[in-house]
């Protein structure tokens, strides 16, 4: 909890309060489904329409979520896939992701790569470096048309791709281009207790 609210509620409030967002689906552990519905009721998250069980990895879980949306929404509708542990996503980030998805067909939230990036084979010594002006750090949300992302997941399964780490990497693995929308250094992923202090 942060400020007496579960982190996921902070995240959901960003989408709840965005005028372009009509509905939310949350993918979670089966044991958390009822808890999440109770949280949504307690904190007045009225746009939460679907809560579905996750799969054995991230790709599975995203697939479960987008397939649920496919049952209820138009294939041309836009879905933004977002990490629950990125509660500091701004309205501007959400809006730009939607705008680029409308314009280009998909949108991956990114920020510039400010650090020097080293290449290694053994984790001990460098074998080279990457030019950081040609690198982007990906964040979420990542935007797609519902029909496109569902078809991508079906094609990936047929191709034997079952454990891609993110929707953007799945797109690349399937030979497709991704387009960039504007992220922020503040849109961090909370992965340690220290992150919460920020």
For the regions a protein language model found, what residue spans apply to each?
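Short aromatic-hydrophobic micro-motifs that form the base-stacking/packing surface
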Residues: 78-82
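Residue-level signal for inorganic ion chemistry
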Residues: 8, 65, 83, 112, ...
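N-terminal glycine-rich phosphate-binding loop and ensuing alpha1 helix
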Residues: 1-35
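Hydrophobic helical membrane-anchoring modules
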Residues: 187-198
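Hydrophobic packing residues within well-ordered alpha-helices of enzyme cores
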Residues: 36-40, 97
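Conserved core of the sugar-phosphate nucleotidyltransferase
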Residues: 88-181
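Short phosphate-binding loop-to-helix
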Residues: 41-77
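Hydrophobic C-terminal alpha-helix "anchor/cap" residues
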Residues: 12-16, 40, 69
């Amino acid at each position: 909890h942060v400020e007496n609210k579960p982190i996921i509620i902070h995240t959901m409030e960003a989408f709840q309060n965005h005028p372009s967002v009509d509905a939310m689906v949350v993918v979670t552990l089966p044991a958390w489904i009822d808890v999440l519905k109770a949280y949504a009721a307690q904190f007045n998250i009225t746009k939460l329409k679907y809560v579905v069980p996750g799969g054995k990895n991230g790709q599975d879980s995203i697939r479960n979520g987008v397939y649920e949306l496919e049952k209820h929404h138009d294939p041309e509708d836009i879905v933004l896939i977002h990490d629950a542990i990125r509660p500091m996503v701004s309205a501007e980030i959400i809006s730009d992701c939607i705008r680029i998805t409308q314009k280009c067909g998909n949108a991956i939230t990114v920020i510039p790569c400010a650090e020097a990036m080293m290449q290694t084979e053994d984790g001990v010594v460098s074998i080279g470096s990457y030019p950081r002006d040609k690198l982007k750090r990906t964040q979420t949300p990542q935007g797609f048309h519902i029909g496109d992302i569902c078809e991508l997941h079906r094609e990936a399964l047929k191709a034997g791709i079952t454990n891609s780490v993110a929707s953007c990497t799945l797109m690349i693995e399937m030979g497709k281009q991704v387009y960039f929308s504007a992220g922020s250094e503040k849109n961090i992923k909370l992965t340690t207790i220290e992150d919460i202090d920020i």
